[in-house]
């Protein structure tokens, strides 16, 4: 959430940032709403001060045996007590209205983010590796998985409906191996602390990371009012909500492998075959909590950590800097890692790494205190996929396909597969 004080002082900057995201200007309406809030609050405070002062004056008047003055003061206090509740309610209402308006404004992009309306304006930052070449025809992952008898979409549909998958045998083991490999890499070499967080969270957790109030259609809600997490970013980032952190101990780096749940409400007709876009999928998430000065360097580091997964798996990929119209709601800058899928003859997103400034820290009321500083500042947050298991599995299946239809196990995963080097058709 953006700071209303910053908006008052940078109205043109906000409207320019919103224009870059394809939205209209909002600074004037927000500032007007804030002026109303401040006027009402000042009036309320004046009434409260007068009530308190009049109450004290009653005692003084009675001590002086000035009953007429005491009676007038009592009448004034009684009237204030009658009108104060309405004024307090109006103050709460306008405060809630302003907070709601602020909570729906996306984060302001950094100056070096390319401006554009959609993914067509994203910029290739770097390309790593080369596209594989074979003599045999590339196939899509679902063709390979079904031919091996290890991927069952029809069975999943009978159980749960569309956009679910059943993995069996060595493909199920391969996805598990991918997750173990990623966690070992991030905890053993990259300095992240592994966490097993809740998969169900409350409204305020979703609000803190920016999923609420705008994106309810993308989420699954339980009958008791909790939410299934769309990403482990939500519980990992909210681990520091309503805390004051020691700035000397930052950054904090967390990682988790969790199921993620998304309704894909806006994806009708897209990627309907296979497991590219699922209601339920597994993902390794990376989250960093840091200070303002270190956030941009931490963004580059986090992206490099996610890239290392793809490098060790021997996968060709590119890094994209997302344009203003394609970035997520809470992000100030985002790098997407897009892995090459031969079966689709296309690059597809496998990781998204974002720096969010203090946008989420403000929503969560997460602060830090520096050693030499007075007071506190809102924490800066970052999140990234390290990486999505389902899409990593797809990439391995398509890039390591052999002419006979078997799949070679990448060297980095052989130990996690119990020494197995090739996945073949189920007996």
Curated annotation (Swiss-Prot):
Query: Is-annotated flag, keyword Transcription regulation?
Result: no
Single biological process term from Gene Ontology: seryl-tRNA aminoacylation
Q: Which reaction does this enzyme catalyse, per its entry? A: tRNA(Ser) + L-serine + ATP = L-seryl-tRNA(Ser) + AMP + diphosphate + H(+); tRNA(Sec) + L-serine + ATP = L-seryl-tRNA(Sec) + AMP + diphosphate + H(+)
- Pathway involvement? Aminoacyl-tRNA biosynthesis; selenocysteinyl-tRNA(Sec) biosynthesis; L-seryl-tRNA(Sec) from L-serine and tRNA(Sec): step 1/1
Provide the binding site for L-serine. Answer: 231-233, 285, 385
UniProt free text on domains: Consists of two distinct domains, a catalytic core and a N-terminal extension that is involved in tRNA binding.
Supply the HAMAP family for this chain. Answer: Ser_tRNA_synth_type1
- What protein am I looking at? Serine--tRNA ligase
